[in-house]
Amino acid sequence: MKDNFYKDVEIALERIQKIIRRTPLQFSPSLSEESEAEVFLKLENYQVTGSFKARGASNKLMLLSEENPKKIITASSGNHGSAVAYAAGILNLDTLIFLP
């Protein structure tokens, strides 16, 4: 199962790498000391949309775009909606995002 998961992650990364930013890792001395392990923070706030949601939304919309959907519809109270709007714009997908 581990091997399949790792392979799926590699495939997703290859799929989305052209539309997402490669964000840095930052070593956290305080968290590392507290946990007695090396802890790094992934700075996804540097992503185009300001959160990690761009990765999952881009991957899903790229997969869906292969099926030529008429419209993508989603609901979000924040980051997911921004990520879907970003990816849909790049992929030229008709999208409706409901913000409650």
Task: Please annotate each region the language model reported.
Residues 1-100:
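PLP-dependent amino-acid enzyme catalytic core
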